[in-house]
Amino acid sequence: VNTGNHEFVDVLIVGAGLSGIGAACHIREELPRASFAILESRSVSGGTWDLFRYPRVRSDSDMYTLGYEFAPWLAEKSIADGADILRYIRETAETFGIADAIRYDRRAVRAEWSSVTSRWRVTIVHTDSHEESIIECGFLWGNTGYYRYDRGYRPEFPGEENFQGQFIHPQFWPEGFDAAGQRIVVIGSGATAMTLVPALATDAKQVTLLQRSPTYVAARPDLDVVAQFLMKRLPRKMAYRVIRWKNIFGSTLIYQLSRRRPEVVKEKLREAIVEALPAGFDVDRHFSPKYNPWDQRLCLITNGDLFEQISKGRVEVVTDTIDHFTVEGIVTSDGKIIQADVVVTATGLELQFLGGMDLVLDGEPCNLADHVAYKGIMVCGVPNLAMTFGYTNASWTLKADLTAHYVCRVLKAMKRRGATSVTPQSPDGALSDEPYIALSAGYITRAASQLPKQGLARPWRLYQNYFMDFWLFRLRGAGDHLEFGRASVRRDESKVVSS
């Protein structure tokens, strides 16, 4: 719709990755008469699953829960390769008629809310031409993930300028890289490092996993035998639902046990690692963190591949800090010399909310850190804005699907009331000191100043619990603690334009 000089859509979705495509599918199915567009800053869809190209990039959640609830995952592997996930996302977009709604090379950089018109005025930079344009929308929905695409977190190391080898950050993996015959050091202890190390060890001369402190890891097969059994004996859509709920129950049980009886989970994880590694391997030094399970995300080892490569002597684990770099490699704080041809800095991500978009409310800058999150989806005092942020203790898409259902319910409630704005109300009383994302990972703690706060009770508190959220988002009334309003001027939406 053209409103004078600017196009207007009912819902503007920012991001065409896993969350954004899912959000658009929900809009298409649940609000078929609503107009919408998807802005994507890159030239292709897929988000994370197109950006990351390092060897054996994969999910660290099973695809029966990382997949959309409305689009069954039918491939054989439960823990899928990145290329298969990307194909699944794009095929879903085609199946639901979403692909044509994506505006590529369009980065939303600024969104200005007007209470007079009940609209967001969004400034877009065309990343292919550096031109700017404007689009207006009734509802703005961020599906941008949680990290910067153009820059990963990369600490500076003493003496790194002396190193004569190659530095690589996994977020920007060089095309055609050949590990054959190379001595490779991977710095980091997160999911990326745990995936990369065994993948590189297949061809490299030697791979060293250099971590400042250990992470909890668990081995898991990439094939789910129960899922395969059900897929062969039930109609596929029914089997997918059963498997999905099975895995939701299983992951919730493990998480709750980790929080309530951490010593039990610690011991079980340790026992499994001791059994998988050679006698004499220092499991306590290299795989026994000081924190409790799920204070940081648990890392998945598919088919025990990391343990296998350690057992073969192709991977060495060093738990120590870096003292300095030399021409030929690294010297640790304990004086160990690690020679390297290539250093991979799997040191994390740089968190970014709403893709770095600036928000302005009636002419005043809006800092989300000054506001309280509502159901982890909307922001108190900020009208007609939603954000998709998945679970940190389970598959991202479980929360993304619930978020999409809830946003559609809110939009329907607005229509029933004849409202043009909806604003969550702030809680009475004190706020929680707990951050919006309750993990102690470095990339989260570094970005605390960007994130909304939590309240002390629902709907302003995040519980990271699918069953509680299912009740809150899908079964409970959609309008609790929401203020609905109407624009003071009538919208002129008479001219339809192509997108």
Per-region residue spans from a language model:
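Rossmann-like dinucleotide-binding core of oxidoreductases
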Residues: 5-8, 12-13, 18, 22-23, ...
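Short hydrophobic core segments
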Residues: 14, 134-147, 184-187, 330, ...
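Glycine/threonine-rich phosphate-binding loop and adjacent beta-strand/alpha-helix elements that clamp
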Residues: 54, 346-414
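C-terminal active-site-capping segments
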Residues: 401, 405-499
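Short beta-strand to alpha-helix junction loop
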Residues: 73-91, 103, 187, 257-266, ...
